[in-house]
C-alpha cells in the first residue's frame, strides 16, 4: 500500500470535474475484493449464514445493523461497500453499448480490423481530432461524418477484403451481409463464394434460393476478437478516448457485483425467510447460467444447446442493466418485472431527479392554511405544536446566555423551550427531556449550541406547490400562535396562488445565521412585492379588502367622531400599537361634525405628521365616465395629493394586484418597501373591520329580477330570435351574402353566434340599469373584488349561448343536437342557447348543453396543467444557467455569450415603472411638484427650462446613464416646455415676469429646484433599475414565460371574426414556437401590397398568390370519342377568369399542363380558340389507351394553373385606420420566398409566423425577431403582459448557435455540453452510456451539475472570484511571551 498523502481533515475538497469511461476487465478485478462463484445465497445448514464467495458475501459490505463489514470492519452507516466480480464463461454484448458496437463494426473492416478510410482521409481526420477545444457536440458530429464515409466503402484499403452492411437482427444479435451485393459487376470474392456451392446446388435444388441470403453472424466472441485487433492508431478515429476505455471493453467478459448496501436483503420474521433485491436475484441467475454453460463445455453438449444458453445468458446480462428491453422473444421473456440499473437512475423517482436534483429536507412542516388579516404581510402564524418540533441551533454568547438558560429549563414540552444541547468540546448531544435541566442550564458555557424551539421573529421559508415562479417561496417572520393551522395575511395570496378551501402549505426553518439573513433580504415578502415578469405588484389587497375600501371611500360615506375613532383605532395592533395617529379636521362642522370615508382612508397612508410619506397619484378608476378628470360623475377618477385622497373611490385598479397605478406600488417606488408593506397591513386591518361593522352580505334577493327587467329581456329575446329566423330564411332561399373565405353554412353560424351573444350583453346592460347601487353582487363587480357583469347578468337575466370549442353545440344525433328538436333545426334553442337565468332555473335540454360547456372547461384545465408543467420544466432546464456577468453580458455556464447586454439595455424587468420602460416621466414630475412646491421660486419659461435641463445633465453624475435614456428625458422635457409655451401664448403671458395678475404664472409652473430634483430622481431610479450582475436571468425568464402559460386557455377557439383566418393561439402556439416546429398548424404570411388602398389591385395580387386549379376555372372537362381518335376537351370559363382577375388564358393552361407531373408531351396538347384546350392521351407499356384517358380525366382538374402550390388560400384583410381603408393579404401556407417575390407584394414588409420558414428565407436574425413577435402576440392576445426582455433572452438562446434550436431534448443536446445536465433532463441512460463511450469530461459548472454534486453554483453569490481584503492594523498588539528575553535569542549571522 502506498502511503496516502497528508491532508488536513477539515479542508473542503471541491470536485473539479468528472470523467466518464468504461472499466476494463483487469481494472474490475483490481477494484473488486472477491470473485463471486457460488450460485447459492445462504449456507444450507441451520445457521443460514451468507455463503462465502456467494452474492451476499459479507466481505462486500453489510446490509444489517448488527453485523460489521468483514473487509473494513465498519458498521452499516460508515462502510461504503466493496465490489466483487463474476467471470462470464462466454462474452456478452453490453446492452448500453450495443448501438456503439454496431457503429464500430460499420466503421472497421471485418477481416483486418483497420478502419475503412484511406491514409489521406485518416490523416485529415486525425489532424482535426488534435484540436484542443473540441466540444462534445463536435465529437458527436465528427463520429457521424466518419461513420458515413466508412459505410460508403465496401473494399478495405488495407487488405482489400470485401465488406457488406452490418445490421442489428433480433434481440442483441448482429449480422454482416458479406455476400450480398447490388452492383452489376459482381465482386470476385462473392463470385468465388457462390461458385463453391455449385456442386451442392446440383444435388439439392432447394439451396439455390437461400444462397442470396447468406450472411455472417457476428456473435460476441467474434466481435471481441475483432475489437482486440483494432490497431491503436485507429482508436481515436472511432472517437473513443484511449484513456477512458478500449473498444474491447464495450463487450462484457466480466461483471462487477455491486456492494451489499446498494441491494439490501430485507429479513421478514414471518417464515424467517428473506426478501432479496432484484439485482441479487439477477446475479444468482447469471452465475447459474454460467455454471450450466461451463458444464456443457466440459461435457461437450450439442452446439445448439450451448448457443441457446448463451443467448439466455446474454439476455439476463442485458436485463440486469436495463430491465425494460423491448423485443424479447416470448419463450425467454421474464415472468415478473424487475428493476435494473437503468430503472434506478431514470424518471421522476429515479436517482437523478428523485435523490440528487431534489430531496426531502429536515426542519420542515406542512399543514392547512387559513387567513388572518391581523398579521402583517411579512408574518406567518405557526402553531405551537409545530414550533416545539422545529428547532434552531443557537450558539451561546454573552448577549443571549440568560435567555437560553430559561429555554433549557423549560425543556422540550413547554414553549418556548429547547430540545437538545451540544456542548462545545464534546460531540455528544444531550436530550433535555430527561436529566436535571436546572443543572444543565447553570452549566451552559459560551460556544455551546442550544437547539431551541422556533420563537417569534424567526425567519422561515413558506411555500405552496405548484411552485411556478420564484414568488411561490418567500421568507416570512414567524409568530407562534395556538391552534393548528398556518395563518397569513390574505394580501399574500396572489403570489402563492392560494385559497383557503383546504390548501396546505410547507414551512422550512433555515438552520444558520447566514441562511436567515439571505432569506430575509432576497426572499423576504417585502423584497418581493412586485413580480419579475413585468414589474407589476403582486402582493396587494384582495376581495374583502377591496370591497371594504371601496365602500369606505364612496362619496356618501360619513362618520361621527366616535365611529371615525373606532374605525381608525383598528390599525393600532401589534407593532403599530404605539404609533401616533392624528385625526384630521372634520369635513362637515354643522349641524354635527362628520368625517368622510376618504379622510379615514388617508389616515391609512399617513397616520400622523411624523410620518414622512407623501404619496401622489392621479389615475382613472374602473367606472371613469370618460371626461372631466377629477369631476367624474361616477367619482371614479382617483387623485391622491401628498397622501390625502382628494377624489375617487378606491377599487381593484388602485389597490389590487396587476396594475402599476396601484397606490401601494407608488409607495414602494417612491418611499420604499417598508412604507408600502406598513400601509398594506393597515388597510388589511381597517377594511374588514369597517366592512363587518357596516354589514355586507349576499342573498337570493340580490339576484331577483324586477318586472321591468323581465319585460326588457323578453323584448330582447324576441328581437334576437326574429333576426336569427331571418338569417335562416335567407340561407334557405339562397340570399345570404357569404363572408370572405366562408361557406354559406359557416357564415350563418357566425352571424347567429354574433346575434345571440349580443342578446346576453344587452340583457346584462339592462340588468345594470335596473339594479340598485346598494346591490351586493353589483358592488363587488364594480370594485373588482369578485365576479363580473357577465356573472350578474347570467344569474338575473339570461345565461346565453353555450359555446363548445368556439362554435355552437354540434350535432350529437342524426342532423340534430338532441332528439327533442326537429332534424336540421338551426334554431337558437336547438343549438345551445340558454334563454333562462340561473334564478329562474334551466330546462333539461338547456341544462344538458350547459354541462357540455362546463365539461369542456374541466377537461381543458386538466390537460393544460400537464402540458404547461412539462413546458416549464423544459424552459427551466435550458435557461437555468444563464446569468448576467460583471461585463454586462449574459452567458451560459460554459462561457458562451447569449446576449452582449441583457435585454439590450441591461435593466431589470422587475424595476420597470412604465410599460417596458424604466420610468414614467410624467408621474415622477407630478410627484416632485407636489412634494417640493418651492413657493418662493419663479416659474421657468420654455427656453429657460431647456437650458436648465441641459446644464444639469452635463454634470459628471449623469455620465453613468446610457445616451438613449438621456435622449428620452430630453424628449420629455421638450414636450413639457412646448406645453408651457402653448399655455403662455394662449393667455398672452410674457416670459419676463411682468404680466398681471401674477397668478397666471402658476399655470404649468415648474421651478429650477423642481427640475433639478426631477433629474436626480430620474437618474437614481434608472441606476436602481440596472440588472445586478449574478442575477439568474435565465431562470426568471423561464418562470415568466411558463407561469402565465398555466393561466392561458389550452384549446384554440377559431373565432369567425378576422376574415375567418384561424390562427392557433394559447398554449399550443407557445409550444410550437419554443419547440421550433418545422410544420406549424396554421402558417400565415402577412403580405403588404405596393398599392394598399386599391381593392381591385389587392384582388389581382391575391389571384397571383392563391393556388388556382384547372378544375376551378373550367366550365367542363369531358372525354370525346371520335371514330379514329379520342381526347379530353377542357372548356375554360372566361367569365370566371375575368371576375377573379386571374392572368390565365388557354396558352398558359397548356404550359401548366405540360409542366405538371402528368407525363404529357407538348405535342399532345392542342389549343383551339381562346377557351378550348384538347389533351390527347398516349398509350404506354403499362396501361392501355382507355386507362390513360381515365387517369388524365381524374388528374387534370388538379393541375395548378396559377399561384403558389403551397398556398391553399389567401384572404384580403381590410385595416380601417384613420378613416382610410388599407388592404393587405393574409396568405395561408408556407412559401415565404415565393410570396415575397410575387409581383405587387412589398417584399420588405412581408412577414410569416413560421420561424423555420423565416430562417430559411431571411436568415437567423429575422428568425429571432419572429420568435419575439410571435410570443408577445400570443401573450397579448390572452391579456398577459410579459416584459420584452424575457422574450428576447429566450429567442436569443434559441438562435445563438446560428440555427433555430427548439427547447426539446434534441435542441437541448445541441445547446448544452454537460453530461450530468442532459442525464438529469431526459434519456438518462443513453446520455451516460454515450459519455462513457466518448470518454467525456464534465467540468461541473452549470446549475444542474452543481446541485447534483452538492457544491455552490456560480450564479449570484457564487459568481465573483475576488473577495475584499480587510485593512489590517500595521502594528498589531504584542503579547509578552515566556521566553521572550534577550538571553534566549539566537543572534542572526548575516
Swiss-Prot record:
The GO cellular component terms are: cytoplasm; cytosol; membrane; mitochondrion; nucleoplasm; nucleus; RNA polymerase III complex
What's its catalytic activity? Answer: RNA(n) + a ribonucleoside 5'-triphosphate = RNA(n+1) + diphosphate
Annotated residues that bind Zn(2+) 1 are located at: 69, 72, 79, 82
Instruction: Kindly list the biological process annotations in GO that this record carries.
Output: defense response to virus; DNA-templated transcription; innate immune response; positive regulation of interferon-beta production; tRNA transcription by RNA polymerase III
* Tissue expression as described in the entry: Expressed in the brain, in the cortex and the white matter (at protein level).
Cite the record's note on assembly: Component of the RNA polymerase III (Pol III) (Pol III) complex consisting of 17 subunits: a ten-subunit catalytic core composed of POLR3A/RPC1, POLR3B/RPC2, POLR1C/RPAC1, POLR1D/RPAC2, POLR3K/RPC10, POLR2E/RPABC1, POLR2F/RPABC2, POLR2H/RPABC3, POLR2K/RPABC4 and POLR2L/RPABC5; a mobile stalk composed of two subunits POLR3H/RPC8 and CRCP/RPC9, protruding from the core and functioning primarily in transcription initiation; and additional subunits homologous to general transcription factors of the RNA polymerase II machinery, POLR3C/RPC3-POLR3F/RPC6-POLR3G/RPC7 heterotrimer required for transcription initiation and POLR3D/RPC4-POLR3E/RPC5 heterodimer involved in both transcription initiation and termination.
Q: Which InterPro entries match?
A: RNA_pol_asu (IPR000722), RNA_pol_N (IPR006592), RNA_pol_Rpb1_1 (IPR007080), RNA_pol_Rpb1_3 (IPR007066), RNA_pol_Rpb1_3_sf (IPR042102), RNA_pol_Rpb1_4 (IPR007083), RNA_pol_Rpb1_5 (IPR007081), RNA_pol_Rpb1_clamp_domain (IPR044893)
What's an example of a GO molecular-function annotation for this chain? DNA-directed RNA polymerase activity
Protein's recorded name: DNA-directed RNA polymerase III subunit RPC1
Q: Which organism is it from?
A: Homo sapiens
Any idea which positions bind RNA?
464, 503
The gene from which this protein is expressed is POLR3A
Q: Required cofactors, per record?
A: Mg(2+)
Amino acid at each position: 500500500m502506498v502511503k496516502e498523502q497528508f491532508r488536513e481533515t477539515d479542508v473542503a475538497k471541491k470536485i473539479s470535474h468528472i470523467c466518464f469511461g468504461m472499466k476494463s476487465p483487469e481494472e474490475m478485478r483490481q477494484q473488486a475484493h472477491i470473485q463471486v462463484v457460488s450460485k447459492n445465497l445462504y449456507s444450507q445448514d441451520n445457521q443460514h449464514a451468507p455463503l462465502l464467495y456467494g452474492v451476499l458475501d459479507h466481505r462486500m459490505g453489510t446490509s444489517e445493523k448488527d453485523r460489521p463489514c468483514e473487509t473494513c470492519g465498519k458498521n452499516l452507516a460508515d462502510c461504503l461497500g466493496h465490489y466483487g466480480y463474476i467471470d462470464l464463461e462466454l462474452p456478452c454484448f453490453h446492452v448500453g453499448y450495443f448501438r456503439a458496437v454496431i457503429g464500430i463494426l460499420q466503421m472497421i473492416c471485418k477481416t483486418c480490423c483497420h478502419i475503412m478510410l484511406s491514409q489521406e482521409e485518416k490523416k485529415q481526420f486525425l489532424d482535426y481530432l488534435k484540436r484542443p477545444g473540441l466540444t462534445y457536440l463536435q465529437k458527436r458530429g465528427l463520429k457521424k461524418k466518419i461513420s458515413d464515409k466508412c459505410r460508403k466503402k465496401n473494399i478495405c484499403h488495407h487488405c482489400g477484403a470485401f465488406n457488406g452492411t452490418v445490421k442489428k437482427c433480433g434481440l442483441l444479435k448482429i449480422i454482416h451481409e458479406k455476400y450480398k451485393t447490388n452492383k452489376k459487376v459482381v465482386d470476385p470474392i462473392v463470385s468465388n463464394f457462390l461458385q463453391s456451392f455449385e456442386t451442392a446446388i446440383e444435388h439439392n435444388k432447394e439451396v439455390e434460393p437461400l444462397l442470396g441470403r447468406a450472411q455472417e453472424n457476428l456473435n460476441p466472441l467474434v466481435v471481441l476478437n475483432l475489437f482486440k485487433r483494432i490497431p491503436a492508431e485507429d482508436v481515436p478515429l472511432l472517437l473513443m478516448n484511449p484513456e477512458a476505455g478500449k473498444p474491447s471493453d464495450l463487450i462484457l467478459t466480466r461483471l462487477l457485483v455491486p456492494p451489499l448496501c446498494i441491494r439490501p436483503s430485507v429479513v421478514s420474521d414471518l417464515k424467517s425467510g428473506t426478501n432479496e433485491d432484484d439485482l441479487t436475484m439477477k446475479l444468482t441467475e447469471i452465475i447459474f447460467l454460467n455454471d450450466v454453460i461451463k458444464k456443457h463445455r466440459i461435457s461437450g453438449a450439442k452446439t445448439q444447446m450451448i448457443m441457446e444458453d448463451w443467448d439466455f445468458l446474454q439476455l439476463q446480462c442485458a436485463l440486469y442493466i436495463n430491465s425494460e428491453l423491448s423485443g424479447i422473444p416470448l419463450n425467454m421473456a421474464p415472468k415478473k418485472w424487475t428493476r435494473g440499473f437503468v430503472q434506478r437512475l431514470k424518471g421522476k423517482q429515479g436517482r437523478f431527479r428523485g435523490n440528487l436534483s431534489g430531496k426531502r429536507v429536515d426542519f420542515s412542516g406542512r399543514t392547512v392554511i387559513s387567513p388572518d388579516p391581523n398579521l402583517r404581510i411579512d408574518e406567518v402564524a405557526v402553531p405551537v405544536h409545530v414550533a416545539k418540533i422545529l428547532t434552531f441551533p443557537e450558539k451561546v454568547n454573552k448577549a443571549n446566555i440568560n435567555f437560553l438558560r430559561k429555554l433549557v429549563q423549560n425543556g422540550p414540552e413547554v414553549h418556548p423551550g429547547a430540545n437538545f444541547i451540544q456542548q462545545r468540546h464534546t460531540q455528544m448531544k444531550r436530550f433535555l427531556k430527561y436529566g436535571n435541566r436546572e443543572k444543565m442550564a447553570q452549566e451552559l458555557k459560551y460556544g455551546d449550541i442550544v437547539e431551541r424551539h422556533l420563537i417569534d421573529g424567526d425567519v422561515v421559508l413558506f411555500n405552496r406547490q405548484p411552485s411556478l415562479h420564484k414568488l411561490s417561496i418567500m421568507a416570512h417572520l414567524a409568530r407562534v400562535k395556538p391552534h393548528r393551522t398556518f395563518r397569513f395575511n390574505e394580501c399574500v395570496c396572489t403570489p402563492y396562488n392560494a385559497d383557503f378551501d383546504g390548501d396546505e402549505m410547507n414551512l422550512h426553518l433555515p438552520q444558520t445565521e447566514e441562511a436567515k439573513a439571505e432569506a430575509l433580504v432576497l426572499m423576504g415578502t417585502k423584497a418581493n412585492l412586485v413580480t419579475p415578469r413585468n414589474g407589476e405588484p403582486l402582493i396587494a389587497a384582495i376581495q374583502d379588502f377591496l370591497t371594504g375600501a371601496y365602500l369606505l371611500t364612496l362619496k356618501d360615506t360619513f362618520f361621527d367622531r366616535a365611529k371615525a375613532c373606532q374605525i381608525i383605532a383598528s390599525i393600532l395592533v401589534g407593532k403599530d400599537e404605539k404609533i401616533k395617529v392624528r385625526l384630521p379636521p372634520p369635513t362637515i362642522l354643522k349641524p354635527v361634525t362628520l368625517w368622510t370615508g376618504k379622510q379615514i382612508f388617508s389616515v391609512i397612508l399617513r397616520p400622523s405628521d411624523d410620518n414622512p410619506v407623501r404619496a401622489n397619484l392621479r389615475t382613472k378608476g374602473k367606472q371613469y365616465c370618460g371626461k372631466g378628470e377629477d369631476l367624474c360623475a361616477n367619482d371614479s377618477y382617483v387623485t391622491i395629493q401628498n397622501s390625502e385622497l382628494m377624489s375617487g373611490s378606491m377599487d381593484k385598479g388602485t389597490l389590487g394586484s396587476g396594475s402599476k397605478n396601484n397606490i401601494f406600488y407608488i409607495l414602494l417606488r417612491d418611499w420604499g418597501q417598508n412604507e408600502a408593506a406598513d400601509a398594506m397591513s393597515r388597510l388589511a386591518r381597517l377594511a374588514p373591520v369597517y366592512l363587518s361593522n357596516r354589514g355586507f352580505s349576499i342573498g337570493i334577493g340580490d339576484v331577483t329580477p324586477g318586472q321591468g327587467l323581465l319585460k326588457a329581456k323578453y323584448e330582447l329575446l324576441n328581437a334576437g330570435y326574429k333576426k336569427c329566423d331571418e338569417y335562416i330564411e335567407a340561407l334557405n332561399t339562397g340570399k345570404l351574402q357569404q363572408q370572405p373565405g366562408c361557406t354559406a353554412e359557416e357564415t350563418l353560424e357566425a352571424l347567429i353566434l354574433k346575434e345571440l351573444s349580443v342578446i346576453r350583453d344587452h340583457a346584462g346592460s339592462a340588468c345594470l340599469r335596473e339594479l340598485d347601487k346598494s346591490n351586493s353582487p353589483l358592488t363587488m363587480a364594480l370594485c373588482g373584488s369578485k365576479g363580473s357583469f357577465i356573472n350578474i347578468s347570467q344569474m338575473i337575466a339570461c345565461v346565453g349561448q353555450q359555446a363548445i370549442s368556439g362554435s355552437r353545440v354540434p350535432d350529437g344525433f342524426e342532423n340534430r343536437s338532441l332528439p327533442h328538436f326537429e332534424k336540421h333545426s338551426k334554431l337558437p334553442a336547438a343549438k345551445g342557447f340558454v334563454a333562462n337565468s340561473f334564478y329562474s332555473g334551466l330546462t333539461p335540454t338547456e341544462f344538458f348543453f350547459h354541462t357540455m360547456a362546463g365539461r369542456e372547461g374541466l377537461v381543458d384545465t386538466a390537460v393544460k396543467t400537464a402540458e404547461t408543467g412539462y413546458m416549464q420544466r423544459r424552459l427551466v432546464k435550458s435557461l437555468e444557467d444563464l446569468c448576467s456577468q460583471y461585463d454586462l453580458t449574459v452567458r451560459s455556464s460554459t462561457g458562451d455569450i447569449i446576449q452582449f447586454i441583457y435585454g439590450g439595455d441591461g435593466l431589470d424587468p422587475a424595476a420597470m415603472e412604465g410599460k417596458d420602460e424604466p420610468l414614467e416621466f410624467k408621474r415622477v414630475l407630478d410627484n416632485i411638484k407636489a412634494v417640493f412646491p418651492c413657493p418662493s421660486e419663479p416659474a421657468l419659461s420654455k427656453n429657460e427650462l431647456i437650458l436648465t435641463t441641459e446644464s444639469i445633465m452635463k454634470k459628471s453624475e449623469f455620465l453613468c446613464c446610457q445616451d438613449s435614456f438621456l435622449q428620452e428625458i430630453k424628449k420629455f422635457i421638450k414636450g413639457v416646455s412646448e406645453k408651457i409655451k402653448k399655455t403662455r401664448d394662449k393667455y398672452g403671458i410674457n416670459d419676463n415676469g411682468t404680466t398681471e395678475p401674477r397668478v397666471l404664472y402658476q399655470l404649468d409652473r415648474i421651478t429650477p429646484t423642481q427640475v433639478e430634483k426631477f433629474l436626480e430622481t430620474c437618474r437614481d431610479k434608472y441606476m436602481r433599475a440596472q440588472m445586478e450582475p449574478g442575477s439568474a436571468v435565465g431562470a426568471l425568464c423561464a418562470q415568466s414565460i411558463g407561469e402565465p402559460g398555466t393561466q392561458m386557455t389550452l384549446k384554440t377557439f377559431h373565432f369567425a371574426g378576422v376574415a375567418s383566418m384561424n390562427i392557433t393561439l394559447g398554449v399550443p402556439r407557445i409550444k410550437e414556437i419554443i419547440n421550433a416546429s418545422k410544420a406549424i398548424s396554421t402558417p400565415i404570411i402577412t403580405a403588404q401590397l405596393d398599392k394598399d388602398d386599391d381593392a381591385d389591385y389587392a384582388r389581382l395580387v391575391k389571384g397571383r398568390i392563391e393556388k388556382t386549379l384547372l378544375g376551378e376555372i373550367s366550365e367542363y372537362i369531358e372525354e370525346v370519342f371520335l371514330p379514329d381518335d379520342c381526347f379530353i376537351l377542357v372548356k375554360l370559363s372566361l367569365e370566371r377568369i375575368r371576375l377573379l382577375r386571374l392572368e390565365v388564358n388557354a396558352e398558359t393552361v397548356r404550359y401548366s399542363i405540360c409542366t405538371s407531373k402528368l407525363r404529357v408531351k407538348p405535342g399532345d396538347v392542342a389549343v383551339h380558340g381562346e377557351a378550348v384546350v384538347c389533351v390527347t392521351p398516349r398509350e404506354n407499356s403499362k396501361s392501355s389507351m382507355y386507362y390513360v384517358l381515365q387517369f388524365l380525366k381524374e388528374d387534370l382538374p388538379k393541375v395548378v394553373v396559377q399561384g403558389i402550390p403551397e398556398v391553399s388560400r389567401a384572404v384580403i384583410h381590410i385595416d380601417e385606420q384613420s378613416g382610410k381603408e388599407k388592404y393587405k393579404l393574409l396568405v395561408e401556407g408556407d412559401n415565404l420566398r415565393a410570396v415575397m417575390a410575387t409581383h405587387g407584394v412589398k417584399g420588405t414588409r412581408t412577414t410569416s409566423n413560421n420561424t423555420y420558414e423565416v430562417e430559411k428565407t431571411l436568415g437567423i436574425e429575422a428568425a429571432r425577431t419572429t420568435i419575439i413577435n410571435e410570443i408577445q402576440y400570443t401573450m397579448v392576445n390572452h391579456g398577459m403582459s410579459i416584459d420584452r426582455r424575457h422574450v428576447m433572452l429566450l429567442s436569443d438562446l434559441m438562435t445563438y448557435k446560428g440555427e433555430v434550436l427548439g427547447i426539446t431534448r434534441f435542441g437541448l443536446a445541441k445547446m448544452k455540453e454537460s453530461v450530468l445536465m442532459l442525464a438529469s433532463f431526459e434519456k438518462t441512460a443513453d446520455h451516460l452510456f454515450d459519455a462513457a463511450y466518448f470518454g467525456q469530461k464534465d467540468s461541473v459548472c452549470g446549475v444542474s451539475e452543481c446541485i447534483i454534486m452538492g457544491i455552490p453554483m456560480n450564479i449570484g453569490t457564487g459568481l465573483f472570484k475576488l473577495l475584499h481584503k480587510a485593512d489590517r492594523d500595521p502594528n498589531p498588539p504584542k503579547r509578552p511571551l515566556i521566553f521572550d528575553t534577550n538571553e534566549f535569542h539566537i543572534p542572526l549571522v548575516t
